[in-house]
Swiss-Prot record:
UniProt cross-references to Pfam families, sorted A to Z: Radical_SAM, UPF0004
Residues at which [4Fe-4S] cluster 2 binds: C186, C190, C193
UniProt domain TRAM: residue ranges: 404-474
Organism: Bifidobacterium longum subsp. infantis (strain ATCC 15697 / DSM 20088 / JCM 1222 / NCTC 11817 / S12)
Function: Catalyzes the methylthiolation of N6-(dimethylallyl)adenosine (i(6)A), leading to the formation of 2-methylthio-N6-(dimethylallyl)adenosine (ms(2)i(6)A) at position 37 in tRNAs that read codons beginning with uridine.
Name of protein: tRNA-2-methylthio-N(6)-dimethylallyladenosine synthase
Originating gene: miaB
Cofactor(s) recorded in Swiss-Prot or TrEMBL: [4Fe-4S] cluster
Gene3D superfamilies: Methylthiotransferase, N-terminal domain, tm_1862 like domain
């Protein structure tokens, strides 16, 4: 959700950097982190930044990034898609072009691809200074020091998690929205997924530690928190408490000043009525849900080792919407999984028609090395592309129809940014309403202009293909009000 992220310049302007006066304005070096992948990687990048700042490094401003006036570039990689390696090596190659004009530039590579390809990275890209994994973020400053001292690439990737990344210092990318990890890793064995290999088995944090972190975020100005985990609703299963996640959601409702709570991602097999009730009954839990379907074919779901079937999936959706009629539910769908027939694909299309997702992250299947599905017989690319195009067209139609239902309604939007370089002249702001839909707002003449983090109740005047527009006419009785 890039709209609620601060720029590097904003982050640099508010960072409490106690080391600058001791080390000079560049500290041990000016750094920039380039993040690929999911929300967990964004969370980890905040920890990487926090560890670096705690060790005397200084975050780059936008001007420094644009001018390549950098001492350290960090790439936090993703391994989920087939082109992950291509993206990683392509980015490392671009970093090397910067190093050619800044010979003292250090380049560090971390994240899931580093966890998988640690040695290959150092061999293929000898200009890389350090390689570190998902489980030893805290080692990065030491590796950089060793590289400076020896001139040799430092590769250190651990298989055992020594401490939760959430226990490390954080340089949060947003003043108002915070990522809070409740677990790391995954115990599922989906045949297409590389995450258990890169992140390991699921480990849950203590609920008290999670709630303490949330309170700290709120004390620092956060108004919204997103709880993160590969499978959030199996939280607590390891200690035998199958109600731990719903208890955590309800506990979030007791935190003063916490306006909005979201979470991602749940697994349909573990999504239970107590979680639905907690969402419906806790005022600051938003009625937004990312609910991965992957396929509407029971045969393909079995081949994927997804421990639910389409009927159960739709039944859960029905219970969610009965409890929360306004719920906006998005999903993930893989097209072209090995062995998928046209009949299987049509079953997916049927489920999409019934589910009426607010949006869908739709992917062409890509084999990941070492996963069971990679060894299965693959489907011709042209067949998969045709199916993909048909599914995207169907979902876009449903999305547009869903957004159209917002026209004329009043929604409360948390402001997360300004629109365009001339926003101070046009007074256009952007944010998300309670169920996560992006809303672009035109501030009526003479009305107060909201700041980032303010809440605006406004009448939606137009639905776009992927967002809503609100250009209210206050004189005609349409709504516009700001809450700080």
């Amino acid at each position: 959700m890039n709209e609620d992220m601060m720029t590097e310049a904003e982050r640099a302007s508010i960072a409490a950097d106690g080391t600058d006066s001791l080390l000079g304005e560049r500290g041990k070096g000016v750094f920039h982190i380039h993040t690929l992948g999911c929300q967990m990687n964004v969370h980890d990048s905040e920890r990487i930044a926090g560890v670096l700042e705690a060790n005397g490094y200084v975050p780059a401003t936008e001007d420094q990034i644009n001018d390549n006036d950098l001492d350290l570039l960090v790439l936090n990689t993703c391994a989920v898609r087939e082109n992950a390696a291509e993206r990683m090596y392509g980015t490392i190659g671009r970093f090397n072009r910067v190093k050619l004009v800044r010979p003292n530039l250090q380049i560090a590579v971390g994240g899931c691809m580093a966890q998988l390809d640690r040695k290959k990275i150092a061999d293929t890209a000898p200009w890389v200074s350090a390689v570190f994994g998902t489980k030893n973020i805290e080692d990065l400053p030491k590796l950089l020091d060793q590289n400076r001292a020896t001139g040799k690439a430092q590769v250190q990737v651990t298989e055992q998690l020594r401490q939760f990344p959430s226990q490390l210092p954080a340089a949060r990318a947003s003043r108002i929205s915070s990522w809070v990890a409740i677990s790391v890793g995954c115990n599922n064995t989906c045949t297409f997924c590389i995450v258990p290999t890169t992140r390991g088995k699921e480990k849950d944090r203590r609920p008290g530690d999670i709630l303490d972190e949330i309170r700290q975020c709120v004390a620092g100005g956060a108004k919204e928190v997103t709880l993160l985990g590969q499978n959030v609703n199996s939280f607590g299963y390891g200690i035998g408490d199958r109600y731990a996640f719903s208890k955590l959601l309800r506990a979030c409702g007791t935190i003063d000043g916490l306006e909005r709570v979201r979470f991602t991602s749940p697994h349909p097999a573990a999504f239970t009525d107590d979680v639905i009730a907690a969402m419906a009954e806790t005022p600051n839990i938003m009625h937004q849900l990312h609910f991965p379907l992957q396929s509407g074919s029971d045969r393909i779901l079995r081949a994927m080792r997804r421990s639910y079937r389409s009927a159960k999936f739709l039944d859960i959706l029905g219970r969610i919407r009965e409890a929360m009629p306004d719920a906006q539910i998005s999903t993930d769908i893989i097209v072209g999984f090995p062995g998928e027939t046209e009949e299987d694909f049509q079953q997916t299309m049927d489920v999409v028609r019934q589910a009426r997702f607010s949006s869908a992250f739709t992917f062409i299947y890509s084999p990941r090395p070492g996963t069971p599905a990679a060894a299965m017989e693959q489907i011709p690319r042209d067949v998969v592309q045709d199916r993909f195009d048909r599914l995207v067209a169907l979902q876009e139609q449903i999305t547009e129809e869903n957004l159209a239902t917002f026209e004329g309604r009043d929604v409360e939007v948390m402001i997360t940014g300004k629109l365009g370089k001339k926003d101070t002249d046009t007074h256009r702001v952007t944010g998300r309403e309670k169920t996560g839909v992006l809303v672009h707002i035109g501030v009526p003449e003479g009305e107060p202009v909201p700041e980032i983090g303010d809440f605006v109740t406004v009448t939606v005047t137009h639905a776009g293909r992927h967002n809503l527009l609100a250009d209210p006419d206050v004189a005609a009785g349409q709504t516009y009000s700001v809450r700080h």
